[in-house]
Amino acid sequence: MKLRRFRLEELQKATDNFSHDFLIGHGSFANVYRGTFPVEGTLAIKKPHSEAYTSTEDFRNEVRLLSKVKHENLVALVGFCEETGKKGPKAAKILVYEYVANGSLLDYIIGKGGRSLTWRERVKIAIGAAKGIGHLHEGIRPSIIHRDLKPSNILVGEGFEAKVSDFGLVRTGPVGDESHVTSKVKGTLGYLDPAYCSTFHLTPFTDVYSFGVILLQLLTARPALDSTRAANSTSHIINWARLSIEKGKIGDILDTNLLVQGCNMEMMVKMGEIALRCVVKVPKERPTMSQVRQELEAALKAADDEDLPPPPPAASMGDGDDDQRKSGRIHRSSDSVVSVDGIGLERFHVELDSVSFQSVSLRCLETSISMD
């Protein structure tokens, strides 16, 4: 779709001259406003701060770069506005994007009074965001590094599909194993890759680190940096969560909403393990975004396979069933993961000889079977 060039007057009218009442997002790079147009409907209008672009050519390069970004998990650029106006050459350099009505991931995991995401919705959002970021890294040439990934920049679309937004800090990625050296570190505290901060070398793994932090937030619903622990080594979510994940005690750090609703613990453990691999100190030892996406998809498929209903019981026990009766069988029920008083349980159906009984076993206990 060809980009539309908007007039400044149109944008001012759609936002009541960029009124605070139309403000839907703000950051160090720009403010974002909601505007409604006769033909296009509701759009998101990103008005950068005056110092955002050093030149008109800088802005045009940004538009050309963003016009290449076409993916279902990336917020699409619809058009732009470039006018000199009355206040000099920086007066109107504005980007116009599609509008995503369901807010950002930050609204759901840190909370603005809305409903909590289910474990499956969290995984689905993580997979969608990984697809979008992976497309930036590998799906276009030259590649693009976002370098400001955080929950407020992951929007939630229809059916809880993730849409990565805010490409105000994007930079053309390096070629091959090279890195792009920047003159100034940009991003958000808590999500900034320490390797990038210390070396100024920007690579796709810079985004992978930020994504690892987001995965931890999806699990825990905690901020990346906890101001109440400012003088404590656990003020960062990575340090706070690491030991519990490494010991397999994911329940100690999970969002309590997940424990109350019930969740697939294996999936949560896997997400935590992937998150820790994303934030290892050496960038090249981190997985790529494509690998992250593939592992999340594989873990979700395994969780779905667990939930498949058992095969129907045989009408009669013939000679061919002798070995089956002797060895016994364990089936996962269609509702294999349940929650009782906030504790994840797994339901089994066990058949031994001609005796059949139901049991529920706590995953955290060594006791294999408890009779109903």
Listing of model-derived features with the role each one plays in the protein:
Residues 1, 88, 93, 261-274, ...:
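Intrinsically disordered, low-complexity cytosolic regulatory tails
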Residues 207:
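Conserved catalytic-loop aspartate of Hanks-type protein kinases
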Residues 1-96, 102-106, 110-123, 129, ...:
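Membrane-proximal cytoplasmic juxtamembrane segment of single-pass receptors
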